[in-house]
Amino acid sequence: MLHSAPAIQELEEWREEFAKTRTEPVPHFDPADAGSAARVLFLLDSPGAETVSAEGPGFVSVDNPDQAAERCWTERNDAELHDGILLWNTVPFFLDGAEPTPVQTIAGVKALKSVLGLLPRLEVVVLCGTFTKNQWAKHMGAFSRPTVIKAPSPGSRGMISKKNQEDFRQAVRRAKRLVG
């Protein structure tokens, strides 16, 4: 499926080159997502262990077997936000449960800037989680093109409170309203 999804090809070519510069695993873009035709980017912190494990899917996807993916899928579905979506990470490589070092963070931010350059139709970025929001504010301020929506992390720690659950739901619904 990966090689038959034209919208994902340019991103996959970028990912392949980027992965050559990393010792950590770099998951693939989801071929079911919009790829370079994305209008909404859901930006999370970093890929989870399930994504890059030998048994895992190898994709950053709402279909992955983890709570963040499930929450993203559920809220997008409830908001009827089905098309023009891409899911990716601020630090696009697996960190083995550790917090990213400053060097890893900078590498992730540089990679993100490259990915944003491959998304000419991007209208909305949903920043999911404190780390992602902080890195965007610190490093991406010059990007005025997409509308930025701040949201809690859809992962288990981020969704502990009912308020965070509702805030995430409202962020997804706002993204839907903005892109129609």
Located regions from the model:
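Short, flexible loop segments at boundaries between secondary-structure elements
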Residues: 77, 81, 144-179
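A polyanion-binding, active-site-adjacent surface
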Residues: 1-154
